[in-house]
């Protein structure tokens, strides 16, 4: 009998695809089951039904995996943050390695050295930034501060025992939640467009211990935050509190953005050390959220580039210039291009902080700016956002004829599409290595080393 949307079916998970999408078959029809793991038998409700595939949501696990372990976090299963805390870490790495390789196989990309995946140095308490949301689990319920509940668009579950951040985060969260519960201030409701409390964003530099607390609200209520500031200052920190901020965000979207920034205490940035260099991180600037993992990731990039003393390196989608600056001490010249002006300003500031005189950072759309750059690169580093490299930018990357390209990807699906274009235009994939920056989640970074055919 044909599968129908809304109906429930018993399914055996046989395969897995990125990002942590279990694959089952029903009468020959491929069914994608989110967070299903091969070996499980599940009861799933069909949410989407197309001619060539269906999508299902797990209602119940009927037969589980023999190697499952107990998750450390009491909110696991209810919280939408972590997917695999109940799977041993070695198995998590095995799954991610398999998912990357399968994507390369499907894209008919082969002939490269597929290196073992690198695990995160820390499986727990690894994050240097966390964005918590104010809300309630059920409409009209008690104020919560934490993560979106699993499978719910608006429900928020408190993350007071979150295990992917350290004790300082948990103490700040609990102090904040207790204070605002007592004050009975309303959280922002995105559909009604009303309320005050939006987010609590905490950044903590792993290697320096500097802590920055950022309370995000609307301007709908004029509330004095002096008492709150003193409460946050009075916490017994393992690290070092350097700033408390109040960000006004009246945007209609769910994204944390800044309409106005007030410094309640200290300063509005932290300094992080990575591989002997210093990086200034501002409230909204992008920075890899796993510092110890980032050191490993950037070491892999440096290794893939190889000897670079006489080389000009292009760092495209450079953000705050982290990768470019880490290779700069060994390079002749580094040119970074980034769309976000604030990130470029941070990159320039960081280069000064590190006494690097061979770095130039340009703000603008890569697809446009790349046309105007006169220098010829010996190495191009690509580190694009999830959608991959813009097709126009990729055309210019190819025209530059760089002997070496190192592609750092946070989305292996778009990575393989870009690699197909590079291979069609004279590049050979030499090596591929996964790097797990996000234990217990489906996400994985992939580093790819390419060489132009005529340089081999």
Curated annotation (Swiss-Prot):
Residues in TRAM domain copies: 2-60
UniProt xrefs under CDD domains: AdoMet_MTases
GO molecular-function term, one example from the UniProt record: 4 iron, 4 sulfur cluster binding
Binding residues annotated for [4Fe-4S] cluster, in chain numbering: 73, 79, 82, 162
Pfam family, one: TRAM
Superkingdom as given in the UniProt entry: Bacteria
A GO BP annotation: rRNA base methylation
Record has Methyltransferase as a keyword: yes
Chain residues that bind S-adenosyl-L-methionine: 288, 317, 338, 383
EC code: 2.1.1.-
Keywords: 4Fe-4S, Iron, Iron-sulfur, Metal-binding, Methyltransferase, S-adenosyl-L-methionine, Transferase
Keyword Methyltransferase among record annotations: yes
Active-site residue list: 410 (nucleophile)
UniProt-listed PANTHER family: RNA M5U METHYLTRANSFERASE (PTHR11061), TRNA (URACIL(54)-C(5))-METHYLTRANSFERASE (PTHR11061:SF30)
Family in the record: Belongs to the class I-like SAM-binding methyltransferase superfamily. RNA M5U methyltransferase family.
Name of this chain's protein: Uncharacterized RNA methyltransferase CTC_01941
Source organism (scientific name): Clostridium tetani (strain Massachusetts / E88)
């Amino acid at each position: 009998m044909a599968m129908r949307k809304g109906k429930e079916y018993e399914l055996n998970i046989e395969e897995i695809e990125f990002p942590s999408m279990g694959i089952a078959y029903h009468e020959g029809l491929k069914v994608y089951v989110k967070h299903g793991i091969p070996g499980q038998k599940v009861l799933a409700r069909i949410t989407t039904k197309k001619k060539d595939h269906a999508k299902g949501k797990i209602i119940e696990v009927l037969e589980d995996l023999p190697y499952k372990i107990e998750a450390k976090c009491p909110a696991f299963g209810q919280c939408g943050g972590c997917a695999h805390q109940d799977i041993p870490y070695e198995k998590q790495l095995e799954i991610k390695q398999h998912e990357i390789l399968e994507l390369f196989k499907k894209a008919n990309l082969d002939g490269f050295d597929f290196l073992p995946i690198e695990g995160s140095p820390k499986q727990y308490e690894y994050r240097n930034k966390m964005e918590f949301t104010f809300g309630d689990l059920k409409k009209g319920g008690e104020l919560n501060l934490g993560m979106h509940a699993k499978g719910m668009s608006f429900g928020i579950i408190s993350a007071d025992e979150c295990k992917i951040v350290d004790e300082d985060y948990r103490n700040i969260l609990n102090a904040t939640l207790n204070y605002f519960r007592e004050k009975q201030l309303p959280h922002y409701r995105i559909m009604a467009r009303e309320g005050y409390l939006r987010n609590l964003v905490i950044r903590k530099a792993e290697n320096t211990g500097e802590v920055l607390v950022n309370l995000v609200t609307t301007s709908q209520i004029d509330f004095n935050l002096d008492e709150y500031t003193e409460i946050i200052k009075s916490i017994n920190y393992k690290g070092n509190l350097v700033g408390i901020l109040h960000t006004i965000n009246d945007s209609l979207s769910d994204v944390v953005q800044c309409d106005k920034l007030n410094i309640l205490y200290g300063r509005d940035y932290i300094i992080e050390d990575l591989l002997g260099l210093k990086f200034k991180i501002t409230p909204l600037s992008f920075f890899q959220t796993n510092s110890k993992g980032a050191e490993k990731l950037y070491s892999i990039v440096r290794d893939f580039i190889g000897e670079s003393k006489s080389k000009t390196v292009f760092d495209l989608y450079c953000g705050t210039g982290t990768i470019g600056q880490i290779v700069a001490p060994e390079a002749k010249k580094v040119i970074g291009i980034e769309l976000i002006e604030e990130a470029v300003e941070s990159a320039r500031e960081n280069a000064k902080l590190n006494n690097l005189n061979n770095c130039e950072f340009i703000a603008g759309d890569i697809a446009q700016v790349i046309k105007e750059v006169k220098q010829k690169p010996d190495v191009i580093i690509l580190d694009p956002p999830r959608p991959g490299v813009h097709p126009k930018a990729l055309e210019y990357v190819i025209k530059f004829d760089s002997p070496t390209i190192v592609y750092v990807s946070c989305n292996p699906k778009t990575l393989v599409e870009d690699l197909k274009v590079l291979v069609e235009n004279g590049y050979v994939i030499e090596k591929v290595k996964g790097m797990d920056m996000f234990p217990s989640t489906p996400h994985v970074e992939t580093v790819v080393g390419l060489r132009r055919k005529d340089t081999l």
